Amino acid sequence: MNDIILTSQKLYKSYHDGTSTVEVLKGVDLAITKGDRIAIIGPSGSGKSTLLHLLGGLDKPTSGLITLGNVNWQKINEKQRCQLRNQQLGFVYQFHHLLPEFTALENVMMPLLLAGMAVKDAEEKVINMLEQVGLKPRLTHKPAQLSGGERQRVAIARALVHQPHCVLADEPTGNLDEATASKVFDLMLELNKKMNTALVIVTHDQRIAERMDRVLVLHEGSLYARE
């Protein structure tokens, strides 16, 4: 059985800046398997977020191949990419990106409703998910009524509620104080293990990186395992 769920092969990404071309990624190869815990570290501006966006189908590479399951990102249209993302990937960012006018329950229901799940079934599933992240008493609270750590836990619940194959997280604890960041990260690892969902985290926090199974360094466009 092939447990590889997301791959990049010979991935290049460059941007044109006036008369010059900036090469951000230079032939990046990466294979992510079920249940993986991967940290991607590197200097600011090295292209870590760019790589995450490419893996998630949020941006297109200059050249190279990205596959999610057996699907080539570049061979499908935007509607199909959205459907595939919603089915198989979860995203967590430094800023929670919760919709301010909706409650925690409603925010986490969004990916399920977009996938066509009935409201009653989605609500039941979300209540269970929010209970797992310790927020059942906060179901009807809007983002402004939640602490920073609680908002990020809602974002994690939203990323995991549809049981994706892989979660891509970009500095998920970057806006939190040390104690809260540690609790949020503990929760992510717990759910990663419980759900066997691959977890790929871009981080500057060495303490977080040390707790992952693999630490990859992105430097001058190349991705390699840290020695």
Swiss-Prot record:
Gene3D superfamilies per UniProt: P-loop containing nucleotide triphosphate hydrolases
Gene Ontology terms describing biological process: lipoprotein localization to outer membrane; protein localization to outer membrane
Domain named ABC transporter: residues: 6-227
GO CC list: plasma membrane
Broad class of where this protein is predominantly found: membrane
Keyword tRNA-binding: no
SUPFAM superfamilies in the cross-refs: P-loop containing nucleoside triphosphate hydrolases (SSF52540)
Subcellular location: Cell inner membrane
Pfam families for the chain: ABC_tran (PF00005)
Entry keywords, A to Z: ATP-binding, Cell inner membrane, Cell membrane, Membrane, Nucleotide-binding, Translocase, Transport
Entries under InterPro entries matching the protein: AAA+_ATPase, ABC_transporter-like_ATP-bd, ABC_transporter-like_CS, ABC_transpr_LolD-like, LolD_lipo_ATP-bd, MacB-like_ATP-bd, P-loop_NTPase
Enzyme class: translocase
Disulfide bridge map: none
Annotated EC: 7.6.2.-
Topology with respect to the bilayer: Peripheral membrane protein
Molecular function GO terms recorded: ATP binding; ATP hydrolysis activity; transmembrane transporter activity
Binding site for ATP: 42-49
Purpose of the protein: Part of the ABC transporter complex LolCDE involved in the translocation of mature outer membrane-directed lipoproteins, from the inner membrane to the periplasmic chaperone, LolA. Responsible for the formation of the LolA-lipoprotein complex in an ATP-dependent manner.
Family: Belongs to the ABC transporter superfamily. Lipoprotein translocase (TC 3.A.1.125) family.
Subunit description: The complex is composed of two ATP-binding proteins (LolD) and two transmembrane proteins (LolC and LolE).
NCBIfam families cross-referenced by the UniProt entry: LolD_lipo_ex
The protein's name: Lipoprotein-releasing system ATP-binding protein LolD
Native source organism of the sequence: Legionella pneumophila (strain Lens)
Species lineage: Bacteria, Pseudomonadati, Pseudomonadota, Gammaproteobacteria, Legionellales
